[in-house]
UniProtKB/Swiss-Prot annotation:
Its main location: cytoplasm. CDD domains: OAT_like. Homodimer. Pathway: Porphyrin-containing compound metabolism; protoporphyrin-IX biosynthesis; 5-aminolevulinate from L-glutamyl-tRNA(Glu): step 2/2. One of its GO terms (cellular component) is cytoplasm. This is Glutamate-1-semialdehyde 2,1-aminomutase. Keywords: Cytoplasm, Isomerase, Porphyrin biosynthesis, Pyridoxal phosphate. It is an enzyme of class 5 (isomerase). The modification N6-(pyridoxal phosphate)lysine is found at K278. Belongs to the class-III pyridoxal-phosphate-dependent aminotransferase family. HemL subfamily. It comes from the Bacteria. GO terms for biological process: protoporphyrinogen IX biosynthetic process. Its EC number is 5.4.3.8.
């Protein structure tokens, strides 16, 4: 008997009806609506460790982790206690506080960044970093990569995530907006290339390098499914600085997840600026950007590039971030544990898919993993065009099979899942059993 048979979704259905009456689409972030997989989104009532409990009382083994922040697991006691202690002193001051200094010092220590500035989201972090790069260089064009998602600022909603659009013929890097409401004039300042195409990047920089303020990239892509960079591509990225462009690593997803120094540490990167979010706030709304002092000192009030925020450095969010990073720093073996779990999960999923006769290609790095429903060798999906060849209907059927068996997977073919410290042997066994049954329900 499946979870869907023992726990009807009446409460979630009723909440979804109410939500649609007052909120566009009934959700506050589009992927939560289950549009690409069908069915009723689960309204969550509580979370603990590796598990979620929905409004109807059904319990799910969670592989979303609030889309990345919950690397320690949900409601971790150290984080909860730190927030409770901070709460006793007030919720927001609109003034400097000691905790923001302490969290900045931790980030500097763990990442090597020379300066850090806090904001309230990953979108704010990338938006601010690009404004800073333009102010520092005096240039206006930026370069991003097809399928890389950097938040929902107008200039970044250009061929972002699943919003793939055809490149304009004859104009290297030209692209169109991924969303209504983004003027073409904004999109015209964003040049888009294929991820993992070093030749195209070299060609663009040779052609227009003196116009480029910044090149922004995800070291590991997560919003087109997990895409892993090649060494040649990483080398080409670092060459953009020869043209005076600022190299910005968007580590909102990978920061503190792939290592204590994020993808920068794992992949031996050397960006000028980095953007963080998710884990850095321990589950509360925090973003940050930082890097070279000579660039960061252009930020107001030190320099001429304005950026501000009412809730930047919020004491509750800072407390959660400090507690999370302290736990990670105190447990350096955690990253090996997460990687081993992901490797065993990938191997088990591969075997289950083969036994069911379902074609899949699995990408994973550290605690991030995507199962692409397509007939290709594992690790061979390297750019958005390859990811887009996946069978989304087959994925949706598999997702529903998992959900019915109590596994809460990312509700999109083009997303990463996230493994936490709370995932152990019982969770791995339960996942592989449910996945095998769900694969049997996918029509070849």
């Amino acid at each position: 008997m499946t979870l869907s048979e023992t726990h009807p979704t009446a409460r979630s259905e009723a909440l979804f009806v109410r939500a649609r009456a007052v909120t566009p689409g009934g959700v506050n972030s589009p992927v939560r609506a289950f549009r690409s997989v069908g069915g009723v989104p689960r309204f969550i009532a509580s979370a603990q460790g590796a598990y979620l409990t929905d409004a109807d009382g059904a319990r799910y083994l969670d592989y979303i982790g609030s889309w990345g922040p919950m690397i320690l697991g949900h409601n971790h006691p150290a984080v909860r206690d730190a927030v409770a202690q901070a709460l006793a002193s007030g919720t927001s001051f609109g003034a400097p506080n000691e905790r923001e200094v302490e969290l900045a010092e931790l980030i500097v220590e763990l990442t090597g960044a020379e300066r850090v500035r806090f904001v309230s989201s990953g979108t704010e972090a990338t938006m601010s970093a690009l404004r800073l790069a333009r102010g520092y260089t005096g240039r206006k064009f930026i370069v991003k990569f097809r399928g890389n998602y950097h938040g929902h600022a107008d200039g970044l909603l250009v061929e972002a995530g699943s919003g793939l659009l055809t490149n304009a013929e004859g104009d290297l890097g030209a692209a169109a907006p991924s969303s209504a409401g983004v003027p073409e004039e904004y999109a015209g300042l964003t040049l888009v290339l294929d991820y993992n195409d070093p030749e195209a990047l070299d060609a663009l920089m040779a052609q227009r390098g003196d116009e480029i303020a910044a090149v922004i990239f995800e070291p590991v892509v997560g919003n087109a499914g997990v895409l892993i960079p090649t060494s040649d591509f990483l080398a080409a990225l670092h060459r953009v600085r020869d043209f005076g462009a600022v190299l910005i690593a968007d580590e909102v997803m990978t920061g503190f997840r792939l290592s204590l120094n994020g993808a920068t540490g794992l992949l031996s990167l050397d960006p000028d600026l980095r953007c963080w979010g998710k884990i850095v706030g321990g589950g509360l709304p925090v973003g940050a950007y930082g890097g070279r002092a000579d660039i960061m000192d252009f930020v107001s009030p030190q320099g001429p590039v304005y950026q501000a925020g009412t809730l930047s450095g919020n004491p509750l969010a800072m407390a959660a971030g400090i507690a999370t990073l302290r736990e990670l720093k105190a447990n350096p073996g955690l990253y090996r544990q997460l990687d081993e779990y992901a490797a065993r999960l990938a191997a088990g999923l591969r075997g289950a898919a083969e036994r069911a006769g379902v074609a899949v290609s699995i990408n994973h790095i550290g605690s991030m993993l995507t199962v692409f429903f397509q007939d290709a060798p594992d690790g061979s999906v390297r750019d958005y065009a390859a990811a887009a060849r996946s069978d989304t209907a087959a994925f949706a059927a598999w997702f529903q099979g998992l959900l019915a068996r109590g596994i809460y997977w990312a509700p999109s073919q083009f997303e990463s899942i996230f493994i936490s410290a709370a995932h152990g042997e019982p969770e791995l066994a339960a996942t592989l059993e449910a996945a095998a049954q769900a694969f049997e329900g996918v029509k070849p």
